[in-house]
């Protein structure tokens, strides 16, 4: 279980941030929780801050940050420990349009070095940052879609695949 945890970075829809901590303190704390050795901790925190555009706000208290910067802090903590897989749950929810563009760009950049799984109900978000989409319906995999090759509109495809099946009683009406 510990080996699996070390390979995965996770950002929940509502990142569990400690508003009274500075960004630096929080990232150091998470790195320690993830078992990053003390000698590597400072380097990993700075690398995660650099990749997420947080270098300038490391000394700031988290409660003073905008929602977009808080999301960046959440993504930075997911990068600590150098995971191969990063899971992002609704990473742009509640962000303004400029922040959405910044986070999308960051996710695409992360995809160059990591496997990124994006969980989202916002299909335009999926189209903007993903190569493939896995569509789930009632807890089951309904389709794997290569977004570059798919000619149909993703929203239409989603509705087609997830529409409730008509029962024989309804067909008679």
What are these model-predicted stretches?
Residues 28, 32, 39-57:
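Conserved ABC ATPase "signature" region
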Residues 61-68:
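Conserved ABC ATPase signature
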Residues 75:
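Hydrophobic anchor residue at the start of the ABC signature
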Residues 80-84:
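A short, proline-enriched helix->beta-strand linker immediately N-terminal to the Walker B motif
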Residues 86-90, 95:
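Catalytic Walker B motif of ABC-type/P-loop ATPase nucleotide-binding domains
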Residues 100-112:
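Helical segment within the ABC ATPase nucleotide-binding domain
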């Amino acid at each position: 279980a510990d080996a699996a945890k070390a390979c995965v970075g996770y950002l929940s829809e509502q990142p569990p941030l400690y508003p009274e901590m500075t960004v630096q303190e929080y990232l150091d704390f998470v790195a320690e929780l993830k078992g990053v050795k003390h000698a590597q901790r400072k380097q990993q925190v700075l690398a995660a801050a650099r990749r997420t555009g947080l270098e300038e706000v490391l000394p700031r208290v988290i409660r003073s940050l905008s929602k977009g910067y808080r999301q960046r802090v959440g993504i930075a903590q997911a990068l600590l420990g150098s995971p191969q897989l990063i899971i992002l749950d609704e990473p742009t929810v509640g962000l303004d349009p400029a922040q959405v563009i910044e986070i999308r760009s960051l996710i695409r950049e992360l995809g160059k070095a990591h496997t990124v799984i994006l969980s989202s109900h916002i299909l335009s978000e999926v189209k903007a940052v993903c190569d493939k989409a896995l569509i789930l319906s009632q807890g089951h995999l309904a389709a794997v879609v290569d977004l570059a090759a798919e000619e149909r509109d993703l929203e239409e495809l989603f509705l087609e695949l997830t529409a409730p099946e008509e029962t024989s009683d309804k067909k008679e009406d």
